[in-house]
UniProtKB/Swiss-Prot annotation:
Factors inducing expression: Not induced when D-valine is added to the growth medium.
Protein's GO biological process: D-amino acid catabolic process
Function description: Catalyzes the oxidative deamination of D-amino acids with broad substrate specificity.
Protein name as it appears in the record: D-amino-acid oxidase
Chief place where the protein resides: cytoplasm
InterPro entries: D-amino_acid_oxidase_CS (IPR006181), DAO (IPR023209), FAD-dep_OxRdtase (IPR006076)
Amino acid sequence: METELDDERDGEVVVVGGGVIGLTTAVVLAERGRRVRLWTREPAERTTSVVAGGLWWPYRIEPVALAQAWALRSLDVYEELAARPGQTGVRMLEGVLGETGLDEVDGWAAARLPGLRAASAAEYAGTGLWARLPLIDMSTHLPWLRERLLAAGGTVEDRAVTDLAEADAPVVVNCTGLGARELVPDPAVRPVRGQLVVVENPGIHNWLVAADADSGETTYFLPQPGRLLLGGTAEEDAWSTEPDPEVAAAIVRRCAALRPEIAGARVLAHLVGLRPARDAVRLERGTLPDGRRLVHNYGHGGAGVTVAWGCAQEAARLAS
């Protein structure tokens, strides 16, 4: 009887962290037959992930080569999920990657992106690429991930932890994002503040992302169901989650310079999220003080959505 109980517990995993990385990792583990409990400090709709613009594209993530591989694995999944956009929140949508040339994607993504081409002058004034990429509506996708986890036999518990050793399972997976700074502790994890403005969509159907080489600012607009997301900012080591009115006005001005109709769009909301940046994603196996297996999966910067499935698959491998 004890042997049967031990065998059953050997299949148990506690995933700590309920953002897109934690949820996706929990789903992959549960669908591979593990008994998964997800512990989350706050509901998914209050995590940093819900503030994400949701465009699939590696942004502020290292190491680049691994991030690209994880992104391509995630692309495979998102392309499948886009067949059910109303349920999953995933759509394949065309738009412009501004200030990006074909040579920058030829080595890793060009073969996987049908229709990738140089943007025309009418589509973008500078050098840019016209691409069809996954755009994920996080307000739909996160609840869908939760339901998929529950359907696979997993459970979700609202629970804050101060020590990873509190997790009572043979395997613990740490997907705490910025929380890893204190929980591990890992001082290499730091916030990169992002602010967005949500407006009524004045009729824009394609996304655009453009980085200014001089200022380092990234300007983007992303059409999501019922709204248009405008961005963005990347403030290093900034902890405030209060929207800055001056920053918001500057975001609207930059977006309106590209599409004038944005200037008069009614503002619906202001959002702020703290990206969990690190000099390199930490995706590796370790041990807790009592010898139990610990898998770290955090530090994805501004690309958590982009690499979620690839990193989840690797984390599941490390947990086995």
